[in-house]
Amino acid sequence: MSADFAGSGRNWSQRRLTTGDPEILWERSPTHGGRTIYAPRMTRKQRAEHVLQRLEQLYPQTPVPLDHRDPFTLLVAVLLSAQCTDARVNQVTPHLFARAATPQAMAQVPVDEVEAIVRPCGLAPKKARAIVELSKILLQRHQGRVPDDFEALEQLPGVGHKTASVVMAQAFGVPAFPIDTHIHRLAQRWGLTDGRNVQQTERDLKRLFPRQSWNKLHLQIIFYGRDHCTARGCDGTVCPLCRELYPRRRTPVTWRKG
């Protein structure tokens, strides 16, 4: 729905107008030819639908970024990816998995040896201890298998909700929506959440998007952020999606870190 309304003033403004739909926000453009033009602003749901459509066009295929062989090697790779790039993890894991690629083998490797291998990923002492300890727990409690259960995964050393979500989605195909600071930032720029932390953003995105889209969309947002909407390369007014969702936005978006 669109309409023209008379008005005046130089500044952008937003207002709710009686249009039969109380959810429509109308944005006022600068006057043109003596007239002020009002056009409907997208609702949050409409923005979500636009994001889903555009990302499907841009990224119809979503390969898992972390190289792995099975749920265990994926779990280890995701743990190593904390505060580290996927590219760096993929350089390190071939050396680690050549030494031990199963819980049975990893549980026998001295922690300091694992630490030396994973040092390029950062936080090596903490990550090495977690990898060896979780391998032992998998043997003791789960018959040497990675559990396909959120609660059981989050009880493993070094495994938080985001890591568990990635494993559930990418190893077992269970609908999940892993949220890191990058997805949190883009969701704020795109007006999909008012969340002050990643937990709130996860709840908002799960409400907005169909459950069957979560696993793929998680990766599509990551790929788009890397290619077009980086932390420093876009301020909410630069990349194609930001411009499409907010064509009249002129002020950079200050995002709240989760």
Which positions does each model-derived feature cover?
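Catalytic cores of DNA base-excision repair glycosylases
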Residues: 43-258
